[in-house]
Amino acid sequence: MKVKAVRGIANPLGTIDAHGTVIESIANAGDGVDILNRHREKIGSGFVHLEGDNVILTGYVDEEQYTAEKIEETGLSVGFNANGVKAREIDGVGYYKDVTITEVSLTPLPSNKGAKVTKVREENKGEQEQMGANETQEIMKQAIEAGVKVRELEAKVEELNKEREELKKEREASIPSEKPEDAERKFMRELGSKMAEMPEQGFLREFANGADLNVVNSLGSITSKYARKSGIYDGAMKARFQGLTLAEDGVDDTFISGTFKAGTDKNKSQTATKRSLRPQMAEAYLQMDKATVRGVNDSGALSEYVMSEMVNRVIQKVEYNMILGSVDGSNGFYGLKTATDGWTKQIEYTDLFEGITDAVAECSISDAITIVMSPQTFAELRKAKGTDGHSRFNELATKEQIAQSFGAVNLETRVWMPKDEVAVYNHDEYVLIGDLNVENYNDFDLRYNVEQWLSETLVGGSIRGKNRSAYLKKKGSLGV
């Protein structure tokens, strides 16, 4: 029986085919594969291996089953299994890694122009057996030189596939999507393990309970791309965040001479007492909505979730605590509302327009002022009239124009702000981390550093100095 020995480039790795697909690597180098005619009937057998960046096919084709006159002018096309792994898509192109080649076809119109037959030799069946042994020895030699025997490769791939399936089953069993509390535990485990890797060198921070907390000096500044997900931070490039970690007994570097807490004597040094805070308490410390971790069922989804939804949720929570504070002060925020430290002026008003004017004057250290109020209070402000009975604002005036009329930069409405109450602060001077040793923080970009973002729990700090903020409340208002 006449057969043709065929050798060719089954797929040039890293190149785009006509379907917008790129194969970056394969998982079954050295495995046997069927050779088909245009992805239909079987016409021969062979195996695939790697030579440089090319997947090479070596095999035999039965002349009686494949009648094309010039196999050497024929292209090649691979069929593959992605093993359940989704393609990484960039600009409409799908990139696949560690795929399993299931078959290689001879075709006159290959989807990848670089995939083609490079060598053809005609011989008898008896010669085929001898050549098959020789070719096999050649490929085995190449594989052995690479550190892996060909006959062991199939077992290794099978073992890896089994491990992948076991891990998948284990993950699905331990984190069922219908139980958000399990997803939360998974998230906190990941967070705890990441935080445990962080260095144990820290400094005192301006928390309400700063003397009771030990923190690491791995700071990160949130980038403008993510800061602007929430308009209250437009232009506030001094928003810095930091994570909590466990402390080593005897470490005495949490205190920096000369640091102070808002509301205390600036010249009075603080006593550096320490207390470890377990990473698992980060959720309670932040008082974040439990929904932040719902739907997270594997590490890939966790990264994607952290990079999108979690960023927005945390910023919104920081805004809330920044202005209203927490009921018991456990989260370390100095809320502007009902501040008793003398650093945030508490103003009662009868005329909303005049009250905001007075509050802006209290923040006169610079012009970078933000005004925050509820939508209902804003609606009232739009209708405000002067002493002459005329409206103070044009009915088509935008928030920016109204803010500018007070000498402010931003005017934001938030549904969680109590009615008839207004927060005014200077966003260039407001720092979420009130350390005075800012030269030692490690800046990072959330778009590229998922691991660092994952390892950091976002927490807030305090207003730094007087003439930065004021809080308005309508006289006699219950603030509901």
From Swiss-Prot:
One of its GO terms (cellular component) is viral capsid. The keyword Coiled coil applies. Keywords: Capsid protein, Coiled coil, Late protein, Virion. Its main location: virion. Gene3D superfamilies: hypothetical protein PF0899 domain, Major capsid protein gp5. It comes from the Viruses. Residues 163-184 are annotated as: Disordered. It is found in: Virion. SUPFAM superfamilies: Major capsid protein gp5 (SSF56563). InterPro entries: Lactococcus_phage_c2_MCP. Disulfide bonds: none annotated. The keyword Disulfide bond does not apply. Residues 138-175 form a coiled coil. Assembles to form a prolate capsid about 56 nm in length and 41 nm in width. This is Major capsid protein. It comes from Lactococcus phage c2.
